Amino acid sequence: EYLQHLEAVLSVLQQHQFFANHSKCSFGQSQIQYLGHMILEEGVAVDPIKVQYMLQWPQPKTISGLRGFLGLTGYYRRFIRDYGKKAKPLTDLLKKGNFSWPEAATTAFETLKLAMTTTPVLALPDFNQPFIIECDASGTWIGAVLSQNKHPIAFFSK
């Protein structure tokens, strides 16, 4: 069955004059690293190399350093429940004014780093099964979880 699917994909690529570079292809793998993610049989996970990189990230001393950290963690926000709520003390520092680092920012910084070490493997959606959406909101943020069979597919927050 795998070989039939592979042949079908390669045939469609060829029909449309697209070509796969053999040196960039991996066939028959049970997992693969792709764009900072690990694609597994069970679903999608954060690349452990990126997690280690985040854990070593020093406390930002400038707005550009903070933007870099938030950019990296924000890329993985779909893996972190209530990301927006956890990151709010840090995103508040991006507003105009003098850059100062309060205790709440230190707590948020460490909370996000810890959250990155405990991210779940997100399930791949099965469009033949029902989806469940759980929502939570307050006056300052909103969060939601999309899941199937009690397995998260993605987390959303703002």
Predicted regions mapped to residue ranges:
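Retroelement reverse transcriptase polymerase core
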Residues: E1-K158
